[in-house]
Structures are given as structure tokens and as C-alpha cells.
């Protein structure tokens, strides 16, 4: 009886041995992070500067890929305790940090409100939002 049981276990286990991995290893994969504002960031970048991180608007002293003005940077520095300079806004990573601060701080769930607030106030924000929407729609077609 014991011998039959042993033979049955061997009959089942030996073929399965070919299916088991030879190395004993655990593989852990990570999913890419969720970036809820990435599409909006790209759209604003295209509308503000055509994606040019070295863009500069002389009349407004707006700097970088998303055209950050001195008054906005002063507000950001005051709120966060940072000491960023306008010249650093040519670096897209730093500009993005400033942009994301405002996107997440005030209107995190609504792209339209974020975009309009980024642009300013008044009726021209409607025109601006239409440009942003157009860029967002282009991204959807590409992706």
C-alpha cells in the first residue's frame, strides 16, 4: 500500500518537475506610476511655448516651457518656502514642479479649471481652454 502511494506520488510529481522553474527566484515587477496631470502638462507646454523650454516672453517676463511669470514664482516660493529663481524656469523639471504644485493644490480634479487658472482670469481663459482642449485631443489621437 505504501509502495503504491509512493509510486502514485512519483507518477504525478515527475512530469510536473519539467514545468517548475530551475532557479528558485521571486520576480517582483512594478507598474509605472500614475501621472494624472501628464497630458495636461504636455498640452499647456505646447500652448504656452510650443514645447520650447527656452521660451521667453519679454513683455511679461514669462519664462520657460509653461511661461512662468515672476509674480507666480514669488507666490510659489512664499507658499512652499522654496527659493527658486526665474532663470531656473528654463529647466522643464523645475517648471513642472511649480506647475504641478498649483494643479494639485487648487483644482486637482478638473483640467479646465486648472488650465484657466494657470492662464489668468477673464474671458480670454475660454479661448485658452479651447487651445488646451485641442492639444489634449491631439494626444488622445496619437496615444
Regions found by a protein language model. Name each.
Residues 34-38, 59, 109:
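Extracellular/periplasmic catalytic domains that process cell-envelope and extracellular macromolecules
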Residues 70-139:
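Alpha-helical segment that forms one wall of the substrate-binding/catalytic cleft
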Residues 53-81:
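N-terminal, post-signal-peptide region of Sec/Tat-exported proteins
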Residues 42-58, 81-90:
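Short charge-dense sequence patches
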Residues 27, 47, 66-72, 139-143:
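Cell-wall glycan
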Residues 35-52, 68, 99, 113-121:
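Short, functionally critical alpha-helical segments immediately adjacent to catalytic or ligand/cofactor-binding
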Residues 1-36, 143:
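N-terminal secretory targeting signals
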